């Protein structure tokens, strides 16, 4: 079941996202009710999932999300007698799109999740719970490249370069102003 804790998800003084505005997921009360019904109907495998932020560039996101979900797993066990089989931490680990940004350190993130696992799940006799992730952007984005060629140049009050690619090839900048670094392969240092 997908859990939506509601409210605003913050790390320190930074607002990461606003789960309370999302249509996805269940409240804690809805999740407990759903699990009780599933248990009564004979379900044998249970898991939870949550998605609180996207493209976070901090090593604190996953450990904080893990802490919330691990505490919820303990509460599910105590109140419903259900030991979860898995917890899906979803995605959300971001990449450094700008050359001056520090990349996320996946080892540091993993260590943070491991510490929370041992602090919360292991003492509650939930040390067998599998942890899943969805690290598509983190794993693939650094390896995606759009190669395009300048086809013409136009000067008015500014200089414009026409290329043999369009928003169809890379929608994110046109759609919501996302930054993607450009390297001139004829002058990579310029």
What are these regions (language model features)?
Residues 118-121, 126-190:
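Charged (often Lys/Glu-rich) extended helix/loop segments that serve as interaction or gating elements
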Residues 37, 54, 65, 102-104, ...:
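Generic secondary-structure boundary signal with a strong preference for alpha-helix termini
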Residues 106-120:
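Glycine-rich and small/hydrophobic secondary-structure elements
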Residues 7-11, 85-101, 132-143, 170-171:
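Flexible glycine/acidic-rich beta-alpha junction loops that bind and position SAM and/or redox cofactors
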Residues 58-65, 96-109, 140-152:
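Short glycine/threonine-rich loop-to-helix capping motif typified by GTGT followed
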Residues 1, 48, 89, 134, ...:
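Conserved, mostly hydrophobic/aromatic
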Residues 1-86, 95, 116, 121, ...:
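Active-site-proximal beta-alpha core segment in soluble small-molecule metabolic enzymes
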């Amino acid at each position: 079941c997908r859990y939506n804790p509601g409210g605003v998800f913050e790390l320190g003084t930074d607002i990461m996202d606003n789960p309370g505005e999302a249509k996805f997921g269940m409240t804690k009360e809805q999740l407990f009710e759903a699990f009780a019904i599933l248990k009564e109907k004979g379900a044998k495998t249970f898991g939870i999932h949550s998605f609180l932020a996207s493209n976070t560039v901090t090593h604190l996101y996953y450990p904080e999300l893990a802490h919330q979900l691990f505490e919820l797993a303990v509460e599910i066990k105590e109140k419903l007698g259900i030991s979860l089989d898995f917890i899906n931490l979803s995605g959300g680990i971001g990449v450094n799109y700008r050359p001056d940004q520090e990349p996320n350190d996946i080892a540091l993130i993993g260590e943070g999740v491991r510490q929370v696992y041992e602090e919360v799940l292991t003492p509650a006799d939930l040390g067998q719970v599998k942890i899943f992730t969805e690290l598509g952007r983190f794993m693939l984005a650094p390896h995606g490249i759009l190669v395009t060629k300048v086809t013409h140049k136009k000067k008015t009050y500014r200089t414009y370069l026409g290329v043999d690619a369009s928003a169809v090839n890379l929608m994110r900048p046109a759609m919501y102003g996302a930054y993607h670094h450009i390297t001139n392969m004829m002058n990579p240092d310029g």
